Amino acid sequence: MCGRYASSASPTQLAEEFEVDDVFDDLPGPDYNVAPTVAVPAVFERRVRQPGGGDSGEVRRRLAPLVWGLVPSWAKEAGIGSRMINARLETVAEKPAFAKAFRARRCLLPADGFYEWYTPEPAPALPGGRAAKPCKQPFFLHRADGGRLVMAGIYEIWRNPAADRDDESAWLRTCSVITTQATDAAGHIHDRMPMVVPREAIDAWLDPSLTDPEQALALLSVTEAGALEAYAVSTAVNSVQNNDPSLLEPLPETEADPVDQDTAPAAPPGQDRLL
């Protein structure tokens, strides 16, 4: 599961890096503790509509805010989005909530890295036989080469059925992070991690004319050289009220709960790299 991440790049940086045509004005600022249901910067492509309706044939790449937590087009209310922050790679092409978006509305969700919480082995019982509550240690996972983590996502455009169709506020753009079985450093901390779009596959991944699910899935099977690294961070990240660069600072080793390599989930055989 990916339930928290950091995204500190400016719109200018993202627009240049991903060769964006249109940059929306209402993009969020740097966020070091991105949580579900907030707006996040996303890159996607849309066909330009003609003034009188219809497809002009032109495709534009956009950098725009999407609310994290996908609301399917058929949903009766937007609250369902808080339960749709992740789409599993294994079922994204078939699951009713995600299949339609996966066919034609794929996106990139740029990140500095993501957070996961490691739960150590249960502590010894307290006096009286009461079980001690294990203390979860947050870790920050990022590219070892310092590059941007380009998470694979899907997005949907939902209209509030109770609102006037011509009311701009009736429309909501939402997204979900595609996740896969964790490997490498992530596999010792949590069993899931975000799926990454390889740089050479970005153009094809965003192409709205690519509607074959199998072809889209194949794009995500390509890996790049490099690996994922993880380090312990302060429990301050546990609260979404905390949001500043200090959340990314490594915790001194004397304060971090070590990850037990013998009891932590191992990376699947032959899958030792994320990027």
How would you label these PLM feature ranges?
Residues 1-275:
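Short linear sequence motif anchored by a di-proline
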